[in-house]
């Protein structure tokens, strides 16, 4: 429905915001499910395809919408809370979906004990090619690697 409305209104971009990290690839099993980037099937610890996967249908539908939309799409999520901005989504042939950007926010990461609660400023420039730009905002009292100012 989001993409149908964006197309009907001739929107220049779409931003989706979710708590969950659905896992995009095979890169980081400590933070998200491992996932075959072509089939989008979740992998078990032994490397086999999982039979239960709550995100595969969602990701397959999202991939189809991103390809058809052809304009910038940002997926913002927390959950694993490792701050990064990247382009992890591939099409079924293994080509990077260049109009898709994943933004993973700061947060309290229970896996590594980091209470990295900061915030992210998003700028929207409808006439720019990428539309969205991002600027991390560090809260001085929440610094974990560099001591907070006295």
Give the role of each language-model region.
Residues 1-89:
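His/acidic metal-ligating clusters that form di-metal
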Residues 81-150:
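Binuclear metal-dependent phosphoesterase catalytic core
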């Amino acid at each position: 429905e989001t993409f149908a409305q964006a197309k009907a209104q001739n929107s220049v971009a779409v931003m989706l915001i979710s708590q969950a990290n659905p896992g995009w690839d095979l890169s980081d099993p400590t933070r998200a499910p491992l996932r075959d980037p072509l089939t989008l099937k979740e992998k078990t610890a032994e490397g086999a395809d999982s039979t239960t996967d709550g995100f595969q249908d969602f990701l397959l539908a999202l991939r189809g919408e991103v390809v058809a939309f052809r304009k910038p799409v940002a997926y913002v999520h927390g959950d694993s809370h490792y701050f990064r901005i990247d382009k992890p989504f591939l099409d079924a042939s293994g080509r990077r979906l260049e109009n898709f950007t994943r933004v993973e926010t700061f947060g309290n990461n229970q896996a590594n004990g980091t209470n990295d609660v900061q915030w992210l400023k998003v700028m929207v420039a409808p006439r720019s090619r990428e539309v969205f730009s991002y600027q991390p905002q560090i809260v001085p009292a929440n610094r974990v690697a560099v001591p907070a100012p006295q």
